[in-house]
Amino acid sequence: MQTLPSPVQATPTETAIVRRKTRPVPIGSVVIGGGHPVAVQSMINEDTLDIEGSVAAIRRLHEIGCEIVRVTVPSLAHAKAMEEIRDRLYKTYKPVPLVADVHHNGMKIALEVAKYVDNVRINPGLYVFEKPKPNRTEYTQAEFDEIGAKIRETLEPLVISLRDQGKSMRIGVNHGSLAERMLFTYGDTPEGMVESALEFIRICESLNFYNLEISLKASRVPVMIAANRLMVKRMDELGMDYPLHLGVTEAGDGEYGRIKSTAGIATLLAEGIGDTIRVSLTEAPEKEIPVCYGILQALGLRRTMVEYVACPSCGRTLFNLEEVLHKVREATKHLTGLNIAVMGCIVNGPGEMADADYGYVGKQPGYISLYRGREEVKKVPEAEGVAALVELIKADGRWVDP
């Protein structure tokens, strides 16, 4: 009789994402890179001169899990307002890691606001803004170097200020605002974005300043992904280990805005690239935070909520799966760190929920079975299922009141 050969012992496959090793960079009380959890950030949309409104907006974001908050600082008046915003947060709430967003010709603004925030974000394409010449056909090396020298002269005081205060800087490149000289030299490409960042990094390094985070954002996902991959490649070649801030700029709103952001951010995170993220939506900033945490949870990078496993439903399903999943979620959504499976029938139930802490499975009409891991604990009438699940979690000491 012919027999099948014994199966070769499979080598376990490590499924956890291996993150790129980066240097730790402080932003207030939060540290990004250096193996720290991927941090979540957003940006308020209030005018910074509205001090009361800005303080309230920062607090709203921080209270729902936004760990770093960015504020726009387009003028010296806005920069000075940040002192009052910071002080009010200290007095009425708590210190919040704050980032000042500085753009056009922002040297004086950046120097002023650096006194009051934890991190200054500059855009290399706009920090020293040269108005494009409409009839230009080329950039000579001399012209390129001349502007480079001006950039260094302008950037140096800010670098020294941040360095001496122990603060940090984000070199934030945007695909849509590359400097004219970069466009002429490298084109409207990921390479131009990377070289723009590297120019500023080299200036910072020459001044012994290494508290840097880098971002390369674009409104088109393929460009954003390519730019960040190339940035990592170039940094590896140059022996640099700066943390990366990920985001798809101008992603829009609604379902597609979330899909677009996830497509860019999650692709890179899955490759181990990225130390802090922002989902940019044309909605209230508070709407961005759950999307960020959802991405991190789905990839296994952070556990901040219940992980629900549920089948898509089919003809074998023995109860209204969508309705029951909703009830289970409403009863348990405030918990953290649990895996709960809701399965419609016995065919796929036990196997598909093998990694779950608790299972809710349809076995026969009108009844459901509750599982603790792989062990069936009890069978109860369907109407009592959710309450019985809650009692099981409580009995195991894993319940907290909402």
UniProtKB/Swiss-Prot annotation:
The keyword Iron-sulfur applies. Belongs to the IspG family. Gene3D superfamilies: Dihydropteroate synthase-like (3.20.20.20), Sulfite Reductase Hemoprotein, domain 1 (3.30.413.10). [4Fe-4S] cluster binds at C311, C314, C345, E352. Its cofactor is [4Fe-4S] cluster. It catalyses: (2E)-4-hydroxy-3-methylbut-2-enyl diphosphate + 2 oxidized [2Fe-2S]-[ferredoxin] + H2O = 2-C-methyl-D-erythritol 2,4-cyclic diphosphate + 2 reduced [2Fe-2S]-[ferredoxin] + H(+). One of its GO terms (biological process) is isopentenyl diphosphate biosynthetic process, methylerythritol 4-phosphate pathway. Keywords: 4Fe-4S, Iron, Iron-sulfur, Isoprene biosynthesis, Metal-binding, Oxidoreductase. Pfam families: GcpE. Binds 1 [4Fe-4S] cluster. It comes from Thermosynechococcus vestitus (strain NIES-2133 / IAM M-273 / BP-1). The keyword Iron-sulfur applies. Pathway: Isoprenoid biosynthesis; isopentenyl diphosphate biosynthesis via DXP pathway; isopentenyl diphosphate from 1-deoxy-D-xylulose 5-phosphate: step 5/6. This is 4-hydroxy-3-methylbut-2-en-1-yl diphosphate synthase (ferredoxin).
